[in-house]
Amino acid sequence: MINNIIKKQKSFFESQVTKSNEFRKKSLKKLLTNIEKYENEIFDCLKKDLNKHKFESFVSEVYLVKKEIKYFIKNISRWSKTKKIKSSILNFYSKDYVIPEPYGLTLHISPWNYPFQLSLNSLIGAVGAGNTVILKPSENSPHTSKLIKKIINQSFNQEHVEVILGNEKIASELLEHKWDYIFFTGSTEVGKIVASKAANRLTPYTLELGGKNPCIVDKTVPLDMTAKRIVWGKFLNCGQTCIAPDFILVNKLIEKKLIEKIKYEIEISFGKNPENSSSYGRIINEEHLKRLESYLKKQKNIIGGKINYKNKYLEPTIVINPTLESKIMETEIFGPILPVVTYNNISDLHNILSKNHNPLAFYIFSKNKKFIDEILKKYSFGGASINDTIIQFLNDKLPFGGIGESGIGAYHGKHSFNTFSHFKSIVKKPFFKDIWLRFPPYPDNFNFIKSILNKI
């Protein structure tokens, strides 16, 4: 089946149809229409898979996809234009330009945590740049994945875009085929496998991964607003967000006050019993719940931690000053557990931060510009928010992506178009007479020419 779909898509791409801007816009408009048609079903599926509140599903999934489609439709023609480039003195009389062109057949493997948004946003970029797409959504969010297939089937012909459902064996099988581009969102561990498979065929790829995202809080901040924004970013989608604050590094002078404010904001957001809150999500499955429970077993100073396996529920949990060698401080948590670690000075801070790889996200709460600038200059990361969390993801004019262990490449808006485009460099020369120095035999004395060129 997979071979047949790939052959169809290859033939369709070679027909040049996808290179038409009008075709791309028409395709995306049809997708937008069907998303709006099935919007309530999308909410229902996200509720079944992750217990997402309808408002959260709209703001963090559906709205972002619709916004991305509209942004592409508005800008495709401009982005696709041939771009004139200033000629070099060495290419006298030439016309230099760059032509963006689609790669061809693209494979997208998407995760379960934001199953609608993270499946569709990369697809929009690929289609908008003129590629064909095969999408493999996660089997861990089955209701949403099945609905995505239904929406895609009503929006595109199979030879243009197709969704293939299945488990990790299907994903492995797909990776054995030759692609012109691979886009993967998921764990660093699986990302390395994808990179290895792509390297065997010299296939370009983007990896959107994760990491331990630090959240630094210094003593200058207003604690009420700081706690509110941290709680929102950490416990959104039950902590299952790749850019969620993974742990807090707080100045020891305000540790107890911040913890009290965080406890208060958790109760304000989700009530005294978050299990009864319609605004609090669920862990995706029992396997991940067991993993999260294992992080808590050896911790002594815990606030929260209640678990209900039947309901896939883990209470919003604070772990106070875990050891830096504990698993909870060495592994991306990806759940509603928030370690709070104290520091006394900038040296302490650097010692703790240096233990981790470059994260996907970085958060600093401070009014001290010098402190903020020092941190931003010293550490490398995918993206950051100052005095807030998550919001760097919302601006489609900013590239979104990691570095090193947290990812390779970036997307969103024009950055998605660039990701899924190859830029051909062209130099066109007229048949004017060339400078005689270009061709052999070369002069032994070229000091005059050398002096001129060295000044340019």
Language-model segments: residues:
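Residues at or immediately preceding the N-termini of alpha-helices
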Residues: I2, N21, E39, L223, ...
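Residue-level signal for inorganic ion chemistry
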Residues: R24, I69, G130, V161, ...
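N-terminal Rossmann-like NAD(P)+-binding subdomain of aldehyde/semialdehyde dehydrogenases
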Residues: M1-Y97
